[in-house]
Structure formats: structure tokens, C-alpha cells
Amino acid sequence: MRLICAIILLFIISSCGGGGSSPGNSSNDTNTDENSTQPCSPYQSGIGAGSTFTCLIEHDNIIRQFYIYVGSTYTSNSSILFSLHGYTSRGLWNMNYTGFQSIADQEGFIVIYPQGTLLPSTGQTHWNVGGWTTGSTTDDVGFINEIIEFIDDEYSIDKSRIYSTGMSNGGYMSYKLACDLSSKIAAVVSVTGSMTPETFDSCSPTHATSIAQIHGLQDSVVNNYGSLWSKPIEEVIDFWMSFNNCSETPETIEINGINGGGIHNIYSNCDNQTSVELFLMTNMGHDWPNFDNHDIQASTTVWDFLSKYNINGLID
């Protein structure tokens, strides 16, 4: 893998410097250039008490970017969370609206915010998942795998606790990782995403995998009942319930609140004590929900779910 470091401008103005030592960088000099051999540069996000870095790697002859947030309480044997942006979006925007930094500071894990590439047919950022992204030749699964290898080289991580979550297209990509990078992904949560027919039809994980779906009945972008390029949420849940050999009848918990509430279905008695869970919110649209305008807080819900599992199932 050829690593390239640069201080970049990607649709926004970024400033680098300060904030601790960079992975692969023993120097305090952050004035690097395109010829530097350093893989990452400190990035002043102004969010969280930990350290943020911006990194560039070359994968499949394309320069790819990702951000690393190292929680302030990071120690050895840390878990890894990939947080994937939606279609037309940016990794930095995802960093801002998810707010995983504060949770990472408390729990001591590392968050990775990768950046998708431009879909040639639309000129919009995307993850290659089939469906409406058909025609893309970007190897996003390989890109995520290469990030994992890089992080494993630079940090002390627990390779049995690598997770993915994402909004919309990022949720679709998280499911694709659970299918196509199953040997490394322990569990995933999709927020307002689903599975494309291509992912659904070819999915063959190597182990029982805990998954959760957070979705709104008012979502007009990724309809709960599916579309030509998106499987209905019920079919997605049924797929994972069947693959994990879960009980077919869920425990249903009502989610009460001032914004319409919802239901939380839990499918248990699955292989390796994994679980399949659905949070279906009555008045939620195509959003990353929080308590300000919904009756669920996505980021804490995501971490509370994922952190219970490793690649072998429920953590004892």
C-alpha cells in the first residue's frame, strides 16, 4: 500500500496543526506537502477532547481520504467504528452530525470517517452498493479493508471488534461490508439505509452477524416498503433473522415520546447470541435522529448496540 500525506481542501476549507502526534508521524512539524511520506496530518475539527487526523491513501489507483478520531481515553486493544456518510454527503459532515466523538472520549474507541468518491453518472459522492450506484467501478470494500490494515499497523486495536454504521447510502454500505467483508466486520447498524437487490442477492457472510436498523415511517427517500433499487426494510430484517437463525417472533418494546414514538423489535435466540433489531419510528423522515426532534438518539443507540458484540457474537 502506498501512503500519501497532504493537507487538503475537499469542498471545505480545512486547517491542520497541533493536537497530538499523528499516526505514522513522529515529528511535531505539520507543514507537510504532497511529497511527504507521512500518512496522516493532524486536523483541527474543534470537536471532542481527543485527536483528529486527516489521511490519504492510494487504493485501486485512486487517492482516497479518511478521517480518524482517537478518543481521549484511548488505550490498547481499542475497538473501531466506521461511520459512513450518505449519498451526496461528506465525511466531515458525518463527523459533525453524528457526534460520535463524545462517545469515543467516554469509551476509548477510534472512529473512522471515510470519504466516498464521485459517481460518474451524477457527479455526487457515493458508496458503490449497486442499485442507483450501478455503473460505479469504485472498490469501496477494498478501500475499507485497506483502512483496517492501516489502522492495525498504527494503533493497538481489537480486530474482533470492528463495526460499521452509516446514514442512507452509508447504511447500505454497512450492510455490504457485513456481507462482503464479513471476516473483519463484527456488527453493523444502518440508519435510514437498506440493502440493494445486488447486495441482498449476493450476501453470504461467514459468521452470524448482529445487525440493527433505525428507520422512519415518513422516510420518502428510502421508503420503508422498498423500491426498484432498495429492498423493503421488512425483507432486510427477515434476511438477517433467517441467516442468524433467530426466533421468528420478536420482543416488541414501545418507544414513547412527544414526537410520535415508535417500536423496537428484538429478534433473539440467534446463533452465537447475536441479535437482529429494528427501531421503527412513527414520525421520523430521512434523518439521523436525536432527542431534539425525535424520540431516539441514533448515535448512543448505535454504540450501545454494537459494543455488546464481537465477531464471535455476544461478548461475555
Locate the predicted segments by residue:
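Short beta-strand/loop motif that positions the catalytic acidic residue
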Residues: 213-215
